[in-house]
Amino acid sequence: MNSYTHLLRVVFFLLVAAPGLVIGQTDEGQTAPDFRLQDQNGDWHALSDFSGQWLVVYFYPRADTPGCTTQGCSFRDNIYAFRGVGADVVGISTDPVDRQKAFSDKYSLPFPILSDESGDVARRYGVLIERGEMNFARRETFLISPDGQIARHYQNVNPDTHTQIVLDDLMALSADGDPS
């Protein structure tokens, strides 16, 4: 078994078989935890940069793995629909900047892919899975309202259908004028 296959098995275990190892919790209606992280191009982004607009923050376990690629490409393919209703998208994982850059370039992802190597942001959002030296973010998404509140928290995400669910919710919330 090569090391990549072993890593994928460990990631699978952490995400499916060991959900109790997640640290923290963030609920709908709460103020979204702040962040300041570097993207795939070395630029810094903070939650406050997106103040006044809807923001989709999706966490994923590891760049350029099958589910994460499906999810990232789905957000890419629907980015104009998100922007059409006044929303932006950011992806966050514990991968280093260079891995985020390779992932973003390979799939032409048109939004910030943020590096949370320390796992601090994932921890504050309650999605960090810690297993010794290996930290991963659980695949979860937060829809943050223009006033910085968590309007929706998506758990048990299916990468094949998730983007459309988030977009449908965003369109309904935007149409209602309801920030939460």
Predicted features and spans:
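N-proximal helix/coil linker or "cap" segments that precede and/or mark the start of modular domains
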Residues: Y4-D34, D178-S180
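A short beta-strand-turn-helix
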Residues: F35-W54
